[in-house]
């Protein structure tokens, strides 16, 4: 069972994604709203993939990604960034493995998760 960590500030989106991914056989860890300790949670949980929104309330997902890439024990972790704004190039330059433009279809997310696992 592939472990996925969802870092998203929209609680409705977290609920929908958690339900969908759980039904598809993924083990899902969620972070909604409280993101200040995201790196600590990633380190503790060791997900196979992090699906992270760019806008995380007080945090910026791209900044979190850059910090993650500087941590030797987490630098190789697979990270898929997502946003309603097309910031694909910025995310890939910061070290993301992939980018999903919102709104996206569930099948697109599944394909991306499987190709990055």
Predicted segments — roles?
Residues 31-49:
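Acidic, metal-coordinating helix/loop segments flanking the phosphotransfer/catalytic sites
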Residues 8, 83:
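Conserved acidic carboxylate
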Residues 104-114:
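C-terminal output helix
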Residues 18, 63, 84-101, 111:
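Alpha4 helix (beta4-alpha4-beta5 surface) of REC/receiver domains from two-component response regulators
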Residues 62-75:
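Short amphipathic alpha-helix used as the core "switch/output" element in two-component signaling
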Residues 57:
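The feature encodes the CheY-like receiver
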Residues 53:
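Active-site residues of response regulator receiver
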Residues 11-30:
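Two-component/phosphorelay signaling modules centered on CheY-like receiver
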